Structures are given as structure tokens and as C-alpha cells.
UniProtKB/Swiss-Prot annotation:
Reaction(s) the record says it catalyses: Thiol-dependent hydrolysis of ester, thioester, amide, peptide and isopeptide bonds formed by the C-terminal Gly of ubiquitin (a 76-residue protein attached to proteins as an intracellular targeting signal); S-hexadecanoyl-L-cysteinyl-[protein] + H2O = L-cysteinyl-[protein] + hexadecanoate + H(+)
Active-site residues annotated for this sequence: 30, 108
Gene: DESI2
Enzyme class: hydrolase
Protein's name according to its UniProt entry: Deubiquitinase DESI2
Length: 194
């Protein structure tokens, strides 16, 4: 595929409560950036690696049952190639680690805005991240939110895979060390019998 790809912001209602609060301009929204038929988003988890994950564009079911697709907003277009975007997302992952997630200062909407600014030079609409502003005025609000709002189901799957990969690497390293130890231990005089 070539350049000049649309950059789309996919917005999701995060809870049934939005049916009541969105009419007065206060909503709880998740967002992700869609480009090249892929959607990138960010969520929190307790580990020091990237909290950025990928879902099928507009597929709220991959995020979990508390999410409902709301709308797609075309933000502009980008001349970056798909490979470039993967590198950009990987670099952003160094800043947007799972354990760096914060409802007011570094949430999914902050990530979407940062990626959008890089890709097409445009921030996301302010209404999407209004909750962050209000929660900065009412600090205890974050502790009142359900935990699943902070870690969408798609991210939980991504985190599980990352942890599984790390576990397999550790097991391989332990097996190699054990084999080396066994080989070194087969020399006479190396062990003392009790």
C-alpha cells in the first residue's frame, strides 16, 4: 500500500452511563487510531512494557463487554508507510508503558492524540478526553472507576502473551544454564557428598 492513508479516530462509549451523561457533555470514552486497516490504542497494566495494543478497527467486542462503538472521526491523512507507523508505535510504546497509565495525565485518549499529531499533525477533538479534565478537578474519581476501564480485554490478552513470551525465554535460559551446570558438574572432585 502507498502513502496518503486516512487517519481515523475510533471512539467507544465505555459504559452504559454514557447514555445519560453524554447529553450534558460528560462522557467516558476510549479511543484508538485507525490507519492502514489497523487500530492502535493504549491501556494500563501493572508491567513496565508497552501498553499499546492493536484491535480490529471499530471492534468494541475485542475491548470488552463494557465498551460500545460510538463513532469514527476522520482526522486527516498521513504519508507515512505502514512500516514507518509500526516503528512510530513501537517508539511511542517506550513512553506509553502499561504501568505509566494515568486517568488524568496519560490515558488512551492522550495516546490517540499523540499518535494523531505525529501522523497527520492534528489533535483529537477535546470532548473525547473531557473526563481527564474533570477527574483532575475531582481527584478521587479515578479510585471510583471499575478496574476493567483501565485495562481493556484486548490489552489483557496482549499482556498475557507478553508475559508468556517472557516466561518461555526465562525457562529456556534456565534450561541452558542447567545443561551447562550439569556438563560442568560431571567433572570429578566438583561436588562434596554429605
Amino acid at each position: 500500500m502507498g502513502a496518503n492513508q486516512l487517519v481515523v479516530l475510533n471512539v467507544y462509549d465505555m459504559y452504559w452511563m454514557n447514555e445519560y451523561t453524554s447529553s450534558i457533555g460528560i462522557g467516558v470514552f476510549h479511543s484508538g487510531i485507525e490507519v492502514y486497516g489497523r487500530e492502535f490504542a493504549y491501556g494500563g497494566h501493572p508491567y513496565p512494557f508497552s501498553g499499546i495494543f492493536e484491535i480490529s478497527p471499530g471492534n468494541a467486542s475485542e475491548l470488552g463487554e463494557t465498551f460500545k462503538f460510538k463513532e469514527a472521526v476522520v482526522l486527516g491523512s498521513t504519508d507515512f508507510l505502514e512500516d514507518d507507523i509500526e516503528k512510530i508505535v513501537e517508539e511511542l510504546g517506550k513512553e506509553y508503558k502499561g504501568n505509566a497509565y494515568h486517568l488524568m495525565h496519560k490515558n488512551c485518549n492522550h495516546f490517540s492524540s499523540a499518535l494523531s499529531e505525529i501522523l497527520c499533525g492534528k489533535e483529537i477533538p477535546r470532548w473525547i478526553n473531557r473526563l481527564a479534565y474533570f477527574s483532575s478537578c475531582i481527584p478521587f474519581l479515578q479510585s471510583c472507576l471499575p478496574k476493567e476501564w483501565l485495562t481493556p480485554a484486548a490489552l489483557q490478552s496482549s499482556v498475557s502473551q507478553e508475559l508468556q513470551d517472557e516466561l518461555e525465554e526465562a525457562e529456556d535460559a534456565a534450561a541452558s544454564a542447567s545443561a551447562a551446570s550439569t556438563a560442568a558438574g560431571s567433572r570429578p572432585g566438583r561436588h562434596t557428598k554429605l
